[in-house]
Amino acid sequence: MSLTARVSLPPHPLVQALHAEWTKLRTVAGPVWLLAGVVALTVTVGAAAAGAAQCQSATCGIDPAKVSFTGIYPGQAAAAVAGVLAIGNEYSTGMITLSLTAVPRRLTWFFAKAGVLTAPVLIASALAVAGSALAGLLILPGRGFTPAHGYASLTAGADLRAAAGAVVYLTLIALLSLGVAAAVRDSAVAIGLVLGLLYLFPIIASLVSDATLARRLQQIGPLSAGLDVQATTGVNSLPLTPWQGLGVVALWTAGALLLGALALKFRDA
C-alpha cells in the first residue's frame, strides 16, 4: 500500500489580504451606511431633478440623461468619503500597525484594500444609476420628453453609455479618494482635498473670463471631464468626448493610487 501525503499549501498573500479586508468591511457599519447614502442621494436628487424638468418644445435643449443622473453630483461625495475612510480609519484607530503586521507586504495590503473597496462601490453605483434611470424613465415622459419633442427613446445606445459611464465614474472617485487618503494619512484632510479637487474646477471655470482657459479647466477637472460621459445631446460641443472625459478621471485615479502606494511603501506606518 502506498500512502500519498497531502500537502496543504498556504493561500497566496494577496488572497489572505483580500479575505482579511473583506471581513473588516462587512463587520463595520460605516461603509455600509455611506454606500447606502450613495444610492439614496443619487436616486432622490435625480428623481427630484426629473420632476422639476420641463420640455415644452422640440428646441428645449435639455439632455434627459444628465437630468436623470443629476444626483451623481451629491452622491459622489458619499463615495469619496467611503474611499477616504477605508484607509483613514486604519490610521485614526491605530489598526494600520496590526494590518501591516498581518500582511507585511505593504503594496499587497494596499491593493487588496483597493480591490475590496471596488466591489461594493461598484454594486452601490450600479444600484444608484439604475434607480436614477428608472426614475427618469417614469417621470420624464410626463414632463414633455416625448417623441413629439424629439426624444424618441430614453433607452438608446447613448443613454446606456451614459449609465455605464456613470457607474464607472463613481467607482473611480472612490478609488481616487482611497489613494489620496493613503498619501496624506488624515481623513479630514483627505476629504477636503478630494472634494476640493472635484468641485473647485467647475467653480473656477465658471468664474474666469477667458474662454480658452475655462475650456481647459473643464478638460482637466475630474468632475467636469468625467461627467461628460453622461451627455447624450450636444456631444460634439463638449470639451472632450464622453470616453475621453472618463479617461481623465482614470488618470487622476491612477495618479492618486500611485502616490498612496509610494507613501505607504516608503514612509513609516
Spans of model-derived segments:
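Helix-capping/transition residues at the boundaries of transmembrane alpha-helices
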Residues: 24, 88, 99-101, 177, ...
